[in-house]
Regions:
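Conserved small/polar residues in nucleotide/adenosyl-binding loops
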Residues: 123-125
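N-terminal amphipathic alpha-helix/helix-capping segment at the start of soluble metabolic enzymes
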Residues: 1-18
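Active-site-adjacent beta->alpha loops and helix N-cap segments on the catalytic face
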Residues: 52-60, 82-85, 104-120
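Glycine-enriched alpha-helix->loop->beta-strand junction motifs that scaffold or abut catalytic
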Residues: 38-40, 92-97
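Glycine-rich, positively charged N-terminal anion/phosphate-binding segment
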Residues: 3-4, 25-70
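Active-site beta-loop-alpha junctions enriched in small/polar residues
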Residues: 23-25, 47-49, 79-83, 103-105
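Hydrophobic faces of well-ordered beta-strands that scaffold small-molecule active sites
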Residues: 17-21, 42-45, 74-79, 98-100
Length: 125
């Protein structure tokens, strides 16, 4: 199920979704245990620095396996991606949601970058 569909479903069910970053196995485990206790869906967010630390493939495998092991509904999200290239890598790795942060660019470059990310997302998600 796509993230937008999940969010609509959760809204109808009067559920909130916890969106939180994880940086390693230990923080991921804590998030999953807490979400499991209250049976809450979770959006597992990764930043460039956490991807650099864990490796993209390893981070995705840990997140997916964790959601499965804890029997949780959830997704993987790129939080404050700094480049179109990183967004592409994350989408190729199976992220269901991405966010680009082009705030340090000029307004024109920000709009151009955001449009590229939207185009990529529509293809993958």
């Amino acid at each position: 199920m796509k993230v937008q569909e999940k969010l609509k479903q959760f809204q109808l069910e009067r559920k909130a979704i916890l969106a939180t970053n994880f940086y390693n196995y230990e923080t991921l485990k804590g998030i999953l245990e807490a979400a499991s206790r209250v049976q809450a869906p979770v959006m597992l967010q990764l930043t460039r620095s956490s991807i650099d630390y864990m490796g993209l493939k390893r981070a995705v495998v840990l997140a997916r396996q964790g959601l499965e092991d804890y029997r949780l509904d959830g997704c993987i999200h790129l939080d404050h991606g700094g480049s179109v290239e990183l967004v592409q890598r994350c989408l190729d790795a199976g992220f269901e949601s991405v966010m680009i942060d082009a705030s340090e660019k000029s307004m024109e470059e920000n709009i151009e970058t955001t449009c590229k990310v939207v185009e990529l997302s529509l293809i993958h998600i």
